[in-house]
From Swiss-Prot:
GO biological process: fatty acid biosynthetic process; lipid A biosynthetic process
Compartments, record wording: Cytoplasm
Major site of localization recorded for this protein: cytoplasm
Family: Belongs to the thioester dehydratase family. FabZ subfamily.
Name of the protein this chain belongs to: 3-hydroxyacyl-[acyl-carrier-protein] dehydratase FabZ
Taxonomic source organism: Acinetobacter baylyi (strain ATCC 33305 / BD413 / ADP1)
Entry keyword annotation includes Cytoplasm: yes
Known catalytic reactions: a (3R)-hydroxyacyl-[ACP] = a (2E)-enoyl-[ACP] + H2O
Cited function: Involved in unsaturated fatty acids biosynthesis. Catalyzes the dehydration of short chain beta-hydroxyacyl-ACPs and long chain saturated and unsaturated beta-hydroxyacyl-ACPs.
Keywords carried by this UniProt record: Cytoplasm, Lipid A biosynthesis, Lipid biosynthesis, Lipid metabolism, Lyase
């Protein structure tokens, strides 16, 4: 079930400059693969770092959390609606192994390892050109308000 940016916007409440998933290319029963195209025009490159632009690691982790949230909706056979969100609840075992720079395509992968009472834990990897840039265990929480 590939998703273009319009479909992704249905699943995530994030908008520019914090929407960090450009496309979903693969969805399995418990896993998802997508990507973020990293452009020199990203706002964060103005300050991180002007003479040596590197994508901030925390934004790579956020991109992994966003793709994990999309998978949470899909695994629940739920389409997003007002009052239903997957929120970034935590990150464990985060490791940064390779710099991500302008022009890179960051491949984002998440695989479910645990689900309990609305809490989901995913093993996540971000790669560039087949080389691991970041690994993390991402935790998201399914929030349902009265509107849902």
């Amino acid at each position: 079930m590939p998703m273009d940016i319009q479909k992704i916007r249905e699943y995530l409440p994030h908008r520019y400059p914090f929407l960090l998933v450009d496309r979903v290319v693969e969805v399995g029963e418990n896993n998802i693969v997508g990507y973020k195209n990293v452009s020199i025009n990203e706002e964060f490159f103005q300050g991180h770092f002007p003479d040596y632009p590197i994508m901030p690691g925390v934004l790579i982790v956020e991109a992994l959390a966003q793709i994990s949230g999309i998978l949470g909706f899909i695994m629940n056979n739920e389409t997003p609606k007002p009052g239903s969100l997957f929120l970034f609840a935590g990150a464990e075992k985060v490791r940064f192994k390779k710099q991500v720079v302008a022009g890179d395509q960051l491949v984002l992968k998440a695989e479910l390892v645990m689900q309990k009472r609305g809490i989901y834990k995913y093993n996540c990897t971000a790669t560039v050109d087949g080389k691991v840039a970041t690994t993390a265990e991402i935790i998201v929480s399914h929030l349902r308000t009265e509107q849902a």
